Design a protein with these regions (language model features):
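Active-site histidine-anchored catalytic micro-motif
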Residues: 127
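Terminal accessory/targeting
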Residues: 2-6, 16-59, 67-116, 122, ...
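Surface-exposed loop and adjacent secondary-structure segments within mature catalytic domains
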Residues: 63
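DG-centered beta-turn motif at the end of beta-strands
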Residues: 9-12
């Protein structure tokens, strides 16, 4: 039986170049799903594109490290009322308010439904903040309550000594398709390593994008274009199939655990 491979494009809604890049990688390449930032500047454009491509599975990319939150979130915003990368320090200091985080997650979930007209296919987060030991239990509980699959980094689970109760997830998640030196072999190596671990399902994160003025302001810009080129390489699908994988998405997971 073939192994399931989810290649998920994060950051849907970040800017129009990102949105168009994800659509290109989905229709012309091997991206099999995406996750949307409902607080991002181009989210309405992303929702419009999703309406034009209803076969694209769209999940929620929970945001706690950039932009404006939907709720006051006083435990996390800076003096300008913005989210930033201070979440890691605040998590270590124990100053995060779980109820505030839960309310923000619920608000982003409801905004997703308003924008896309349906529930997300699954949940993950920007900068993987849901894997912080102070946040994982509450995000996992929310996903279970709503019967939504969840991106779970088993390495982070082991490193923090966390317990996993949610069964709707891939056996393995890999975030290493990222950086300045990406090649097609980089991606294929991740498949080979997951196979050696005996995983029957694997999720790989990616960020394929074109480049526009907004994207040029990102600290991770040019590599997104490289990702797009790799993920739309016509030689890639047979190499994936040769390794016993087929492209999948979280719509295939059962609706309850």
């Amino acid at each position: 039986m073939s192994k399931r491979l989810i290649i998920n494009a994060d950051d849907f809604g970040l800017c129009r170049a990102q949105n168009y890049g994800i659509i290109e990688a989905f229709t012309q390449g091997v991206v099999s799903s995406t996750t949307a930032i409902v607080t991002s500047p181009a989210i309405e454009h992303a929702a419009w594109l999703a309406g034009r491509f209803p076969e694209l599975p769209v999940g929620l990319h929970f945001m706690l490290s950039w932009g404006l939150p939907l709720t006051p979130l006083t435990c996390l915003v800076n003096e300008q009322g913005m989210l930033d990368k201070g979440i890691w320090q605040k998590s270590e200091a124990g100053t995060l308010d779980p109820e505030e985080i839960r309310c923000e997650l619920a608000s982003q979930y409801q905004r997703f439904i308003t924008l896309f007209g349906k529930a997300p296919t699954h949940i993950d987060s920007h900068h993987h903040v849901h894997m912080l030991p102070t946040l994982y239990p509450l995000v996992e509980a929310f996903a279970m309550e709503h019967r939504l699959p969840l991106r779970i980094d088993r390495g982070e689970i082991a490193r923090h000594g966390l317990s996993v109760h949610h069964t709707l997830s891939c056996d393995q998640f890999d975030a290493r398709f990222y950086g300045e030196q990406l090649t097609r072999d980089t991606l294929l190596q991740l498949l080979d390593e997951a196979d050696e671990l005996g995983a029957s399902s694997l999720e790989i994160m990616c960020h394929p994008s074109f480049i526009d003025l907004e994207m040029q302001g990102s600290s991770y810009c040019q590599p997104r274009l490289t990702e797009l080129a790799i993920l739309t390489d016509p030689a890639l699908p047979p190499l994936i199939a040769k390794r016993g994988y087929r492209l999948a998405n979280y719509r295939e997971w059962p609706t309850e655990s």
